[in-house]
Amino acid sequence: MKKLTAVALGVSMALTLGACSPQQEQNNQQSQQAEETQQQLTSGVILENFDHSAKPQNDLFRYVNGSWIEKTEIPSDRSSIGAFYDLREMNQKRLRDIIEGAAAANPEPGTPERKIGDFFNAYMDTETLNELGAKPIASDLEAIQALDSHEAVAEHMARMFRSGVSIPFGFYVYPDAKDPQTNAMYMYQAGLGLPDRDYYLKDEEKFEDIRSEYVSYITDILGMVGLENTDEAAERILDLETKLAEVQWSRVESRNADKTYNKKTADEVSGMFANFDFKRFIETSELSHVEEMVIRQPSFFEDFGNMFADVDLQTWQDYLSLRLVNEYASALSEEISQRRFDFYGTVLRGTPEQEPRWKRAVDATNSVLGEVLGQVYVKEYFPPEAKEKMEGLIENLRDAYGESIKNLEWMTEETKEKALEKLAKFDPKVGYPNEWRDYSELDISATDLVSNYKAYAEFNYQEEIAKIGGPVDEEDWGMTPQTVNAYYSPVRNEIVFPAGILQPPFFDMDAEMAVNYGGIGAVIGHEMGHGFDDQGSKYDGDGNLQSWWTEADRKAFDERGQKLSEQFSQYEPIEGLNVNGDLTLGENIGDLAGLTIAYEAYKMSLDGEKAPVLDGFTGSQRVFIGWAQVWRGKYREDAIRQQVMRPSLAG
């Protein structure tokens, strides 16, 4: 995003693609000699994926990936395929080896190694799961059906809330945006069964069909767990969730860092809830000690509080039953798990089949015991020299970003000085955390999968609430080392790159650096860019949510951002469905910043020397080829629709 600022939006895509034209750099004797001195390095270019019938200056993506696109089919158990998928697939296999290796060693009960083996085995034991059916949650369903008042519903929501089951609102613990050294409790709208509020509110035929399928799914899944009159319950649930959707904020509104920071006392929050017994909820949630909370969407909580008592008791019982079943369906019988997938996997994302059981078991084990697996993962698959090389890349990108800020013609010196100060304070984290999570208080069974999920939810909940009001742990990570992703945290002013993404095609230790600048370099620049995008730029170098721009500079920046938003809003990946440029603006700024800064950093890294020509491509060309390679991908139409409506790109 900062590149948006740094290059001022005046750089056209045509010029960017033109950088891959072979005529732009001379393949003279000097570059050939440089090539000879670096023959031990590969180009990192995946030549077999190229489509030479395409012109790189017209369609770089197809030029670099066209052959791959034509010959690649999306696996039947996936909604998409691409570079991210390839890495995740490889990591799944690696994690399976780690899990099975730990289990085969017959470790002592209670050890981390025993816990990952027991959890995995419990997930793989389909014979027991099928025999039990819905019995593991029968008592939970009975408790919901026994609720005899709205006060009891509020209290029971608290029990579900702490066990990780979705209710109409949620919370998380994160540094206070206006006191970033202290952890605060943030509350946000939640509780919908469909991916976004628009799935309930849009009149298009596609969404009407999805709602019809949703009603069928609810009818079936609640019947499978033993409830009666589920067709009527399904209609009541859809009606309730539609009412919740009507008062929820849009995703664009929920991106606004200023509007979503609303600190309230516990008494003020209780007053917002009106007819919902929030004090009873807080007591049951063990949150009575929390004096202040940050409310992200205040009007939603007020509207929810007003409507709560108007919704009859039976409807709340239906709704909570569905929330419970949705949460635990994958831990029940194969029949129940399959029915959930038929809707959420096939109807919503177009994926024909579930992944093999072992892959789901690996993902589930990873979601619960990720840092146990992560410790072994980094020892086996992330060499120290990769961390060192990555840290050098980050500093090169930081230098290039600083130069771009200094050269901005439209930004005043006052704002430039503060922007450079923020850039200097970026805290990069690479590979893995310095401190590992302690799972000693978490009990895992080798035979009871649902109890494992419940135990982890309570374990995680107690860890989180203990942080509220306390000092921020600077060593805390938001991702496990094996995660194929990266992120920027504005309130921490940190950029984080787990070991999982630091592999080819993003980061290739055996390749000459040009392709790495186009791959992981652009990812680094992307995350840095988030520090200066339309929302990240509202935080200063210490993570405080406060204005540090002059009024004129903010206006100039917003005008440029609006142009980018308008450009992306013209893109129509599916007929009749346009990208929402306001919603994707942060990611678009990050991408523009990332690639541009990565290219500038690469040129700076040459220090006046000629780049080698490898596989017939100059250094500059390989930077842009590297960028195109990491974004190769194919998507099913339903997956594209969901991605457009709720974008979740890396970072």
Go through each PLM region and give its residues:
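Positively charged n-region of N-terminal signal peptides that target proteins for export
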Residues: 1-4
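C-terminal motif of bacterial Sec signal peptides marking the signal peptidase cleavage site
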Residues: 16-19
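Bacterial signal peptide processing site
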Residues: 21-23
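Post-signal peptide N-terminal segment of mature Sec-exported envelope proteins
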Residues: 26-45
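Intrinsically disordered, low-complexity linker/terminal regions across diverse proteins
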Residues: 38, 275, 294, 298, ...
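Active-site-surrounding "flap" and adjacent substrate/cofactor-binding loops of secreted or lumenal enzymes
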Residues: 38-41, 52-58, 63-129
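Stable alpha-helical elements in mature extracytoplasmic
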Residues: 53-57, 64, 91-95, 112, ...
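Noncatalytic, helix-rich "gating/capping" subdomain that lines the substrate-entry/channel surface
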Residues: 100-392, 396
